[in-house]
Amino acid sequence: MRVAVTGTPGTGKTTATGRLDTALDVAHLNDLVGTEGLYDGVDADRGSKIVDVDAVRDHFAGREDVLVESHLAHRLDDLDAVVVLRCAPETLATRLQDRGDSPEKAAENADSEALAIILSEAVRGHGADAVYEIDTTDRSPDAVAAAIQAVLDGDREPSAGTVDYTDYV
């Protein structure tokens, strides 16, 4: 099984996937990008690596039994399931600023969340029948992990389009 856990930065991907009890190899893409050199350069304005998506796809090509966690994980090929973590934009902006992001970066990510950018990309790339949307706003990390586990165990139906934050914009 090839699974992506994706979502706007700050939705809880790393925390939740760290609590899963799964036989899948859990890969934290943000770590791999640096250690494996899967980037083209650095964005001087944001201070972040510019991910080479083709290199990432090549890195995971042919690998089965893997769960990839990242805000870019939905861009991988041949995924069996894409779990998109969502969070209320106001809560997301607070989380991001609490962890040290600038107000501008937090606002940019909150706007992306309100517009469902990652969800839209996931559905466009993999179809609604492969996408599972989970709202993390009022859930504990353990509850989010349990919801992801339900997807892995086949106990949850696809749910793309069930969370709506467009009133934020």
UniProtKB/Swiss-Prot annotation:
Keywords associated with the record: ATP-binding, Kinase, Nucleotide-binding, Ribosome biogenesis, rRNA processing, Transferase
Pfam families in UniProt: AAA_18
Positions of region (LID): 98-108
Catalysis performed (reactions): AMP + ATP = 2 ADP; ATP + H2O = ADP + phosphate + H(+)
UniProt xrefs under Gene3D superfamilies: P-loop containing nucleotide triphosphate hydrolases (3.40.50.300)
Secretion signal, residue range per the UniProt entry: none
MF terms (GO), sorted A to Z: adenylate kinase activity; ATP binding; ATP hydrolysis activity
Quaternary structure annotation from Swiss-Prot or TrEMBL: Interacts with uS11. Not a structural component of 40S pre-ribosomes, but transiently interacts with them by binding to uS11.
Biological role: Broad-specificity nucleoside monophosphate (NMP) kinase that catalyzes the reversible transfer of the terminal phosphate group between nucleoside triphosphates and monophosphates. Also has ATPase activity. Involved in the late maturation steps of the 30S ribosomal particles, specifically 16S rRNA maturation. While NMP activity is not required for ribosome maturation, ATPase activity is. Associates transiently with small ribosomal subunit protein uS11. ATP hydrolysis breaks the interaction with uS11.
Family: Belongs to the adenylate kinase family. AK6 subfamily.
Full protein name: Putative adenylate kinase
Protein species of origin: Halobacterium salinarum (strain ATCC 700922 / JCM 11081 / NRC-1) (Halobacterium halobium)
